[in-house]
Every structure is written in structure tokens, then in C-alpha cells.
From Swiss-Prot:
One of its GO terms (cellular component) is cytosol. Coiled coil: none annotated. This is UPF0246 protein BAV2675. The lineage of its organism: Bacteria, Pseudomonadati, Pseudomonadota, Betaproteobacteria, Burkholderiales. GO terms for biological process: response to hydroperoxide. It comes from the Bacteria. Belongs to the UPF0246 family. PANTHER family: PEROXIDE STRESS RESISTANCE PROTEIN YAAA (PTHR30283:SF4), PEROXIDE STRESS RESPONSE PROTEIN YAAA (PTHR30283).
Length: 257
């Protein structure tokens, strides 16, 4: 069983990390080809393409210029420790033990516009390139066309030999669209997190993102082997709602009031 996560825009390359174990990213050549395209863009063009402020655009132009095909602990950091958005605050990877990180390495995949798919301990140089960016490349007009069936084929390879391959999708729609479902062999189970607000159950973006990270943390701590094992998830007030769920959609709800 594999858990899919989105990356985060917010990165942390400053906080000291304990983990010295790392692996090399798998799609370096594909990432290098994207960097080559990005290096042709000015800060103004990057700002327009990615809807960034001038300061952020200039920061990322600098990142593309500094990017190298060689990844070390001097120029990169393990992906799960570098991402720092709502999902990763829920996951709290820095507090995972070495054996828990090893389990995550085998069961968690982080989707990425630049790197395609990252394992938690894969080294990652800082970047900004969201999957929905309309970056034209020789392969097409956007990143979905660039990655094509590559990510799905990789996920198939990861689950080769498993009797009933299953993917728990905790990624956003923007990122999951990069997984070609015609190529993918595994059953996909979606996790939905809803809060009661204004008299109705709603997906509140900030809470849902954090909950995705909490779910991965729960799976790591319990070494979850099946989607059924996730039904016991109860972090921060969420409870599995069987009546709102189906075999391929697990709905968790909580009342904040």
C-alpha cells in the first residue's frame, strides 16, 4: 500500500535535521530538462507564469541557476524534511524515529512538478514549480503532458508483485491529475476530511491539508497494511463516518463547535 502526498510551497532548509540517511531522487534527468527550460525565463516571466511576487520570482530564478544534477547534503535536504506546509506540520516528520522514516520510505510517495515522484528520504534541492503550472516543454504545453504516464508507471513498479495493489490518495486534485489512471493498475482509495460548519459538512482547505499529514503519521505509527486499518484514525477529533464512506472513499468528520 502506498500513500500519495502533494508537496508544499513552503520550504525549510534552515532548521537543523538529525536524519543523516538519504537517497537520491529517481527522475533527475527529467528534472534537469525542466530546469533547463526554467533557466531561459526572466524573473518577470516566472512571476507571470507562477503568479508570484517579484521577490519570490527572483528567489526562484536564483534557485534554478544554482540547481545541479548532483545532490548532496550541502545543496539538498531529504524531501519530507524540506517541505513545510500544512500537510507536513500534521506529519511532523522531524520527530519520526529512524525505523519510522524507513517505513515511510517504503510506503509514502510525494508528487512533485519538478521531481515527478519523491520518496521521503530522497534529496531535494529547493524549487518552486507547481504541477498545474503551464510550462511549455518539448513534450507539451504543461507538466501533465511532460510527465505523461511516467508517474503512474513508477507507482506500478513500486507495487509489482503485490496481490492487491492499493494507493491511498492524500494528494490534491492538482497533483493527483499527474497520475495517469489508464496506466495505473492499483485500486485508489480517497481520504476525505470534513468539518461541520454553518450547518453542513465542508472540506476546509487548511484543516483538510493538516489532516492528510496526520493520516500519514497515523499510518506510519501503526504500520497500516490495509485501507480498512485507516478507519480507526482518530487524530484531533476526526472520526470515520461509515454512512458517508464507500469502499474507495473514506470520509472522516469532526465537529469543532
Amino acid at each position: 500500500m502506498l500513500f500519495l502526498l502533494s508537496p508544499a510551497k513552503k520550504l525549510d532548509y534552515d532548521t537543523p535535521v538529525q536524519a543523516q540517511t538519504y537517497t537520491q531522487p529517481l527522475f533527475v534527468e527529467q528534472a534537469a530538462a525542466l530546469i533547463k527550460v526554467l533557466k531561459t525565463k526572466s524573473a518577470d516571466e516566472i512571476a507571470g507564469l507562477m503568479s508570484l511576487s517579484q521577490a519570490l520570482a527572483e528567489l526562484n530564478v536564483g534557485r534554478y541557476a544554482a540547481w545541479k544534477k548532483t545532490f548532496t547534503l550541502d545543496n539538498a535536504r531529504q524531501a519530507v524534511l524540506a517541505f513545510n506546509g500544512d500537510v507536513y506540520e500534521g506529519l511532523e516528520a522531524p520527530s519520526l524515529s529512524a525505523s519510522q522514516l524507513d517505513w515511510a520510505q517504503e510506503h509514502v510517495v510525494i508528487l512533485s512538478g519538478l521531481y515527478g515522484a519523491l520518496r521521503p528520504l530522497d534529496l531535494m534541492q529547493p524549487y518552486r514549480l507547481e504541477m498545474g503550472t503551464r510550462l511549455e516543454t518539448p513534450k507539451g504545453k504543461n507538466l501533465y503532458e511532460y510527465w505523461g504516464s511516467t508517474i503512474a508507471a513508477y507507482l506500478n513498479e513500486r507495487q509489482e508483485g503485490e496481490g492487491a495493489p492499493c494507493i491511498i490518495n492524500l494528494a490534491s486534485e492538482e497533483y493527483f491529475k499527474a497520475v495517469d489512471l489508464k496506466t495505473l493498475k492499483a485500486r485508489v482509495v480517497q481520504c476525505v476530511f470534513q468539518d461541520w460548519k454553518g450547518g453542513a459538512w465542508k472540506i476546509i482547505s487548511f484543516h483538510a491539508k493538516r489532516a492528510r499529514g496526520l493520516m500519514v503519521r497515523y499510518a506510519i505509527e501503526h504500520r497500516a497494511k490495509t485501507s480498512e486499518a485507516l478507519q480507526a484514525f482518530d487524530r484531533e477529533g476526526y472520526v470515520f463516518d461509515a454512512s458517508a464512506s464507500s469502499a474507495d472513499k473514506l470520509v472522516f468528520r469532526r465537529r469543532l463547535d
